[in-house]
Amino acid sequence: MHNQYGSLFSITTWGESHGPSIGVVIDGCPAGLPLAPEDFLPAMKRRRPGQLHTSPRQETDSVTILSGVYQQKTTGTPISLLIQNEDASSTSYEQLNDCYRPGHAQFAYEGKYGFADNRGGGRSSARETAARVAAGVVAKKILSSQGIKTLAFLSGFGPLENKTYPKLTDPLIRKVYSSPFYTILSQEEIQNLLLHDPEDSFGGIVSFITSPLPIGLGEPVFGKLPALLAAGMMSIPATKGFEIGEGFASAHMTGSTYLDSFIAKEGEISFQTNRCGGTLGGISIGQPLEGRVAFKPTSSIRKPCPSVSKDGEPITYKTPKQGRHDPCVAIRAVTVVEAMLDLTLVDLLLQHRCAKL
């Protein structure tokens, strides 16, 4: 398995959905960064299940710092973070020993390894992303020390979509973090969709934005900022699409409508628009980074689905009533997208510091 992400600033996550705990080891964090257990609370609360429109699984997601921190300062050594699994229930997964769940990774894992942990998806479960969010807290503190702000939010839910990118401000950040379910969509329309067919699930889109980034983040040729971001975002469970700026819509434009014109403003060169999403040649250009990540509908639904037993016999699979799943994974994926954004930017920031003397 490939459990590591990043180069100079890297993370290695471990653990399974229904194991005793999950966690992450962070390597490459500079010494002297203030870090305390309470720093993890806001981000972990945003991702935590058991909230509005999410899985009823109850997890406190308290983060325990095992190493790499002394007197609430990072020491420059690997930081190990532990999160206990407190509410795992494996009874509803016992039937999976004899059949395959449509849309899940179980079939692929068994084909690759000859064995799979069916309890809650095991290693392939989105439960693993709690460790990424914890690591993202450390990355965000580094970015904040450099004046870089980041944010992700729900911009698509089923047939609902809003493609606008708001300007990143401190009031917006406070609003997002203080809300149990922030979105630029109509919450009433989302509620109506969920009530219309409670046995089904929905896909969604998560947008991300940053404050203007320093010029130079991203490495030619295979370390481009969008390329590394795409790898990070597409590693999140249930992702099916990624774009920067206008993304796929740019394929339907002409050059004259797409190009971001240069302008001189107060003695500095800038851009009239930001259709490129903040990068040229895969390198940041002093503009905000803007992009979106698409998530497929949750595979665990109450509606009957055609499947087969492990002997190849046709069956009808239906998620057990006691099973606990999100109606739309994109809702809780918001914090995961933000974490992967932060982790990628910190790694590239450190690489940029090494690019020239």
UniProtKB/Swiss-Prot annotation:
<feature type="binding site">
    <location>
        <position position="324"/>
    </location>
    <ligand>
        <name>FMN</name>
    </ligand>
</feature>
<dbReference type="InterPro" id="IPR035904">
    <property type="entry name" value="Chorismate_synth_AroC_sf"/>
</dbReference>
<dbReference type="GO" id="GO:0004107">
    <property type="term" value="F:chorismate synthase activity"/>
</dbReference>
<comment type="subunit">
    <text>Homotetramer.</text>
</comment>
<protein>
    <recommendedName>
        <fullName>Chorismate synthase</fullName>
        <ecNumber>4.2.3.5</ecNumber>
    </recommendedName>
</protein>
<keyword id="KW-0285">Flavoprotein</keyword>
<feature type="binding site">
    <location>
        <begin position="296"/>
        <end position="300"/>
    </location>
    <ligand>
        <name>FMN</name>
    </ligand>
</feature>
<comment type="similarity">
    <text>Belongs to the chorismate synthase family.</text>
</comment>
<feature type="binding site">
    <location>
        <position position="47"/>
    </location>
    <ligand>
        <name>NADP(+)</name>
    </ligand>
</feature>
<keyword id="KW-0057">Aromatic amino acid biosynthesis</keyword>
<comment type="function">
    <text>This reaction introduces a second double bond into the aromatic ring system.</text>
</comment>
<keyword id="KW-0028">Amino-acid biosynthesis</keyword>
<keyword id="KW-0274">FAD</keyword>
<dbReference type="GO" id="GO:0009423">
    <property type="term" value="P:chorismate biosynthetic process"/>
</dbReference>
<feature type="binding site">
    <location>
        <begin position="123"/>
        <end position="125"/>
    </location>
    <ligand>
        <name>FMN</name>
    </ligand>
</feature>
<dbReference type="InterPro" id="IPR020541">
    <property type="entry name" value="Chorismate_synthase_CS"/>
</dbReference>
<dbReference type="Pfam" id="PF01264">
    <property type="entry name" value="Chorismate_synt"/>
</dbReference>
<dbReference type="GO" id="GO:0005829">
    <property type="term" value="C:cytosol"/>
</dbReference>
<dbReference type="GO" id="GO:0010181">
    <property type="term" value="F:FMN binding"/>
</dbReference>
<dbReference type="GO" id="GO:0008652">
    <property type="term" value="P:amino acid biosynthetic process"/>
</dbReference>
<keyword id="KW-0288">FMN</keyword>
<comment type="pathway">
    <text>Metabolic intermediate biosynthesis; chorismate biosynthesis; chorismate from D-erythrose 4-phosphate and phosphoenolpyruvate: step 7/7.</text>
</comment>
<keyword id="KW-0521">NADP</keyword>
<keyword id="KW-0456">Lyase</keyword>
<dbReference type="GO" id="GO:0009073">
    <property type="term" value="P:aromatic amino acid family biosynthetic process"/>
</dbReference>
<feature type="binding site">
    <location>
        <position position="281"/>
    </location>
    <ligand>
        <name>FMN</name>
    </ligand>
</feature>
<dbReference type="InterPro" id="IPR000453">
    <property type="entry name" value="Chorismate_synth"/>
</dbReference>
